[in-house]
């Protein structure tokens, strides 16, 4: 394999060999460092003097050995690890493995523990005059030095010979050269760095000389930056007090404020889950008064809060690399809740709220999700968001995990995340009594990994460049618009097919046109109960809002019945005692009264449609519709309803058809010519007369 070459790079006027990634970060984020140092990289802030707190070893390693870095950056970072001492030796060894995967080898890796070979390499290096040899020579001298003063003297060679004042100053800060003997010399190196910044990045010089802008931080924001176990009760009490104040006023502004405060409480819940302190979420819920809890977690969400917390905590910890064991979902009640459609949907709604709370800026200033964590805040937010999105997938595609649509929704996961989840769930399944659901999840992840991404699948892009900034505000735009708008084409398309096919209009939401609901067979089944809704509960646009005052009935079916009600005059057959003057005769010729049916059947058609009441009634031959007794039909939209249990017929558009089976359905009506009743082959005796047009 090819040995590494030590080369000096210049990034916007900043020359460096040991810290090219840091130099690139400073050059790309000078405004952020000046205006919002709290959200900047901690190593950068420490080097520029914005903070006196030395970053942790992990934070230093993230900058000198970044993920997906080039072989050049990786080799330079390995040299820094050797200078920083034994604490960074494991980082050096892991860097050597990564470098070999890139087809290169570090020249010191195989001989670092062999003093004889190191001494021989140092002698050979003195004979070379390249910058590569000069840097290696200084590096070997620093590694052989014992005292801090001696180390600094050797490092200062980089400043005089190679103009690497920036590297010398950073190493001096990290090694803690703060003795009085070295203070004056370090100040000279610092002045050299600020002079270089003046020509290329004047804002960085201003920061090093004047220090960072110190904005006044309100006590509540300061409280949120302290460890959660110390601040949780005070933070919840503060939010609840503001929530109750807003509840005293019923206007749009107070509703918006209450929504924001509710998400602040949910943010605290998600923070506890990301921090591995799941019990803190229960504390947060218990500190909320019942009235506040009912608004933040309405309805069934309050009942499934525990299950949502356990599911979210499980997946978040997997994404954050936790190796601890997890509780059986059946034991904590999560498995049972997932089996219920409505409880599962309530869990999904909570998971969506969890995601919004970390993606949106719920507070007046950006608050890191885990202030005390050594991990980059943006990395934490990305992992938590992906974890919650996968937990949401579990709830939304429960029972259909292996379907194509479900697999396409997993494209947001990277191959590394899928493998991590598969390994974790396989270990998790070993201790379960019922493994069906978990096995379905594993199978879906494996299928998604092996299949090619769909062209319509959701695509995500990530940037591993050096311009990464640790701010939640920059992550807000990632999922701001979770719903897409579906445009239905209107030219060159079969609109009937488009309208009747299901369309995806949002996450797990589809819509399709359907035929209108047919008229009910029994009019008596219609519920004509008057509405009792108060004006405060329902508004004219159908939304629950205190700013509207027009009432709507609670049952839309009532409105439909009112709209469908026929406005034509209804003619009711006279009672037997009133029919003495009919065509049957008069006086003693009155026929024996027939039983009056209970139901009155309402029909409607193209023309006026009277109610057919009783077993028979005569209509004129030129009327708008024919009435049949034993199954007669009529012209118009619908046939008459047949007696003796008959159902109603259908409207025709051409010639009228003959009524059929008086015990089953009435005859088919017509638009131009009425139909006649038919029963036992006798037409017109008890049947209806011919209808008109």
From Swiss-Prot:
It catalyses: [RNA] containing guanosine + H2O = an [RNA fragment]-3'-guanosine-3'-phosphate + a 5'-hydroxy-ribonucleotide-3'-[RNA fragment]. Residues 445-468, 523-591, 620-693 are annotated as: Disordered. Residues 633-693 are annotated as: RNA-binding RGG-box. Residues 581-614 are annotated as: Required for interaction with sepa-1. The keyword Lyase applies. May form a homodimer. Interacts with pgl-1 and pgl-2; this association is not required for P-granule localization of either pgl-1 or pgl-2. Interacts with sepa-1; the interaction is enhanced in the presence of RNA. Interacts with prmt-1; the interaction is direct. This is Guanyl-specific ribonuclease pgl-3.
């Amino acid at each position: 394999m090819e040995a590494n070459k030590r080369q000096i790079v210049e990034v916007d006027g900043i020359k460096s060999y040991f810290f090219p990634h840091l130099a690139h970060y400073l050059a790309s984020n000078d405004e952020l460092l000046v205006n919002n140092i709290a959200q900047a990289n901690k190593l950068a802030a420490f080097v520029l003097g914005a903070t006196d707190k030395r970053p942790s070893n992990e934070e230093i390693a993230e900058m000198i050995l970044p993920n997906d870095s080039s072989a050049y950056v990786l080799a330079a970072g390995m040299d820094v690890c050797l200078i920083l001492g034994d604490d960074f030796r494991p980082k050096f060894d892991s860097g050597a493995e990564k470098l070999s995967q890139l087809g290169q080898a570090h020249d010191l890796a195989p001989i670092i523990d062999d003093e004889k070979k190191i001494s021989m390499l140092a002698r050979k290096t003195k004979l070379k005059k390249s910058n590569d040899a000069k840097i290696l020579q200084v590096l070997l001298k620093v590694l052989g030095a014992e005292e801090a003063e001696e180390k600094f003297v050797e490092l200062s060679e980089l400043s005089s010979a190679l103009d690497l004042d920036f590297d010398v100053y950073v190493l001096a800060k990290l090694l803690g050269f703060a003795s009085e003997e070295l203070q004056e010399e370090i100040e000279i190196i610092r002045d050299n760095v600020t002079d270089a910044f003046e020509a290329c990045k004047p804002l960085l010089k201003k920061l090093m000389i004047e220090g960072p802008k110190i904005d006044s931080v309100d006590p509540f924001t300061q409280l949120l930056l302290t460890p959660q176990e110390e601040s949780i009760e005070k933070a919840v009490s503060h939010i609840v007090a503001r929530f109750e104040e807003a509840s005293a006023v019923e206007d749009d502004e107070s509703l918006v404020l209450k929504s924001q405060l509710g998400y602040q409480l949910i943010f605290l819940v998600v923070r506890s889950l990301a921090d591995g302190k799941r019990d803190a979420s229960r504390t947060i819920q218990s500190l909320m008064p019942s009235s506040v809890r009912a608004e933040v977690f309405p309805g069934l969400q309050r009942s499934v809060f525990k299950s949502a917390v356990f599911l979210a905590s499980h997946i978040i910890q997997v994404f954050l690399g936790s190796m601890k064991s997890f509780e059986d979902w059946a034991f904590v009640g999560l498995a049972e809740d997932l089996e219920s459609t409505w409880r599962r949907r309530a869990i999904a709604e909570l998971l969506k709220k969890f995601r919004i709370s970390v993606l949106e800026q719920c507070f007046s200033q950006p608050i890191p999700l885990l202030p005390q964590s050594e991990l980059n805040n943006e990395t934490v937010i990305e992992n938590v968001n992906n974890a919650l999105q996968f937990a949401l997938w579990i709830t939304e595609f429960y029972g259909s995990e292996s379907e194509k649509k479900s697999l396409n929704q997993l494209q947001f996961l990277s191959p590394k995340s899928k493998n991590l989840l598969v390994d974790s769930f396989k270990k998790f399944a070993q201790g379960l009594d019922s493994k069906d659901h978990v096995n379905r999840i594993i199978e879906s992840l494996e299928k998604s990994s092996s299949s090619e991404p769909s062209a319509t699948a959701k695509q995500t892009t990530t940037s591993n460049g050096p311009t990464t900034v640790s701010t939640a505000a920059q992550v807000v735009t990632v999922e701001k618009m979770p719903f897409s708008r579906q445009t239905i084409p209107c030219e060159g398309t079969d609109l009937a097919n488009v309208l009747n096919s299901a369309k995806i209009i949002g996450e797990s939401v589809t819509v399709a046109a359907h035929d209108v609901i047919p008229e009910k067979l029994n009019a008596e089944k219609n519920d004509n109960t008057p509405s009792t809704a108060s004006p405060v509960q329902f508004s004219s646009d159908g939304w629950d809002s205190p700013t509207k005052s027009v009432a709507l009935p609670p049952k839309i079916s009532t409105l439909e019945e009112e709209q469908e009600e026929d406005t034509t005059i209804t003619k009711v057959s006279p009672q037997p005692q009133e029919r003495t003057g009919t065509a049957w005769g008069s006086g003693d010729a009155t026929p024996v009264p027939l039983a009056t049916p209970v139901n009155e059947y309402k029909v409607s058609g193209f023309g006026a449609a009277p109610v057919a009441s009783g077993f028979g009634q005569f209509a004129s031959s030129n009327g708008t519709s024919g009435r049949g007794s034993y199954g007669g039909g009529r012209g118009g939209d619908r046939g008459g309803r047949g007696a003796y249990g008959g159902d109603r017929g259908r409207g025709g558009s051409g010639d009228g058809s003959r009524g059929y089976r008086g015990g089953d359905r009435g005859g088919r009506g017509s638009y131009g010519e009425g139909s006649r009743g038919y029963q036992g082959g006798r037409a017109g005796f008890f049947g209806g007369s011919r209808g008109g047009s």
